[in-house]
Each structure stands twice: as structure tokens, then as C-alpha cells.
């Protein structure tokens, strides 16, 4: 069974649990190393993400069938059980015998305890027999596999219990792959036809112009339209932020926390590649990532740089028409894409508003009078969003919120701020505020 989809999922889950690895990046690396075809790569991804999306619920059921507390099991054995249980409970197309037998084989290969395979076999076969009689837990934390602290955070923000449950459920769905068309090189219809010819399931976004929804892509790098720089991957929420900012041809734009470069690309395309977009990140390897993306897209207006958003550059003072500050954040709006983020230690999150405020304070000096400062995050926590903006405005009367209108369900935003929700807008969870400098 070397290089199987289930084995790659197991290795990724174990790396997440033991090493703190991010599932998406680690799994892609293992899939490449194993040379999995498109179908097996999709299965490995579904298994890994499915287990992470439902880990607390899977453990709830497994704990009822195991003679030992789950905490006493070898990590690899527990992951084998979770993989098997996920397939039994959620993947109706997988034959139950395959779900059990492949999990047993993985336990036999990776567990230190020679009896582990037999235990995995027994627990999963018991689950097969009893699954229809098992009740769904009432606790939202267990039912939707969100730690209690996170359920409370979202509850404090949303207040409405029905909205809360809808958000938790949306976090466990698979987001579409969203492609933004590089209209400097191709038209949306041309890109759509090229992708269809390569076997990609593609449709136009229902409300966002020059945007396509992709499925069954396999590796994006293999697609000729990707290689030709006809599109880049970016969720609709991030593109909406750039639309609200109002990038226009000839502008001087600073993207202060730019990696992997999506908003810089969106601004450059909106500007017709005329003007300048200074695209910064604190890490040199991310500057290289932005540069590679800009070169693939043929966007010559983008100048990548390594720069800390908190470090002042005097030559940039009042030099930009538009400054975008998509600051480091808790990332709790992109749980659909990073399901393991919910299990990270929440303690470091307390210090984020101070970092965000420091970046916003610094880059605000780069906005020329009459220019725009766009503050953005991919989180849903008020203290990182409106809280940071309110604190900034109290200290900077020369800035004020400016309303905008967006396509789609968000519509008019007269207050100059908007939070996009996965369960309401079918986008990433995202916040942005548009601030205009008067003097």
C-alpha cells in the first residue's frame, strides 16, 4: 500500500498533531512525493480535511467503543481510527469493508503495538454495527468540532443561535476554488473555454465579474491557462476588498502585508497594469513568491519588496494614493481552507490587536491627503476588526470611514466597514474597512 491516498492522509494528520504542521501544505508535499494521480490526490485531501473538520465528533463516537481512553492510544493508532470512522460515517461511496481494512493495514504498518491492528478492526466493526443507533451530540462544540473557546468567541460576535450554528456548519464545508481572471491577458470566456478543454469543471461566479469557480482541477500548475498567466487563485472576499478600495490606472499603491500577492495582483489588474504597486512582506521567501506570481501573470507594475509593516520608511511618507493593510490575524475566517487552525493554541491571539494596530498606525503615514487606507483581516473576531479600526480613528481625526457598494449579497456598505461570513456570503470570513485621509 505504498503511496496510497489513505497513507498520505494519515501522515499529514500525524504531522499536524505531533509537529504542528499545517495540513494543506504538508499534504500537498506528500501527494507530490507519492506521485498520486488526480483522483487519489482528491481522496487524500478529502480524508485529511474531513477528519480535521470532524475530529471532536469522531472522537465522541470512538470513545464510546474503545475500552481505553483515547488519550492513552498511540497517536498513529488514533489517526487510523479517525480515518476509518470518517469514511464509515461520512463517505457513503466508500465500501465499509475498504474503510475498515485499509485502516487496519495502516495500523499494522505504523503502530508500535502489535495488537493495535486488531483493536482498530474491532472498534471500526463495532462502529459499523452501531452507527445508526448512535445519537448526534447536542453540544455544538462536539457536533461541529469547534473547541469550546472558539464557539464562545463566535457566539459573542453573532449572538443569534441559528446564525452561530449556520457558521459552524459552513466551516465544515469544502470551499470552491475561486479563480480571478487576469484581464490584462485574457477574457473570462476565453479562460473558461481553455479550462473546460483541459477537463476542469468550471462555471462563472454568480455575482463577481471576471471570476470563475473551479472544481476537479488536479494540480493547477499543469493547466496551460495557469502557466500562461490567465488567472490567479483568490477568494471573492479578498477581491471585494480591492474593489472597495477603488484602485485605478496610474495610481501609486502600497500593499503592506502582501503575501502571497492576491490583492497586489487584483489591484494591478484593476489598474490595467498602469501605475505602480509596491508589494511587501516581512519574509524574503514570500517576496520571491510574490515576484514569481507577478512574473507568471505578466504584471509589470508590481514591485515586490521585503519590508516589515511596522518599520517606518521616511521616503514613503504621503507617497501613495492607496495603502492596503491586510494584517496578520487569527485566520478564523478561513477555517474552511485551514480546518486545523481551530485546534491551535488560542493564547497568542490576545496579542494580535496590538500588532495590527501598530501596522495600521505605521502605514497610515504613507497615505497622501485625499488617499485611501484599506484595513483588512481574514478573521471574524471584533477585537481584531472594528476594535482596531475604532482605536485608530480615535487617534487619527484626519481619517474617516467612507462607504462603498459591493456586488453580490454584501451590497451597500454606507458605514465604510463590512464583515463577510461564509454562511451568508459564500466567501471566506473576511473584514475590511475603507478609510479616507482628508489632510
Each language-model region and where it sits:
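S-adenosylmethionine
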Residues: 1-439
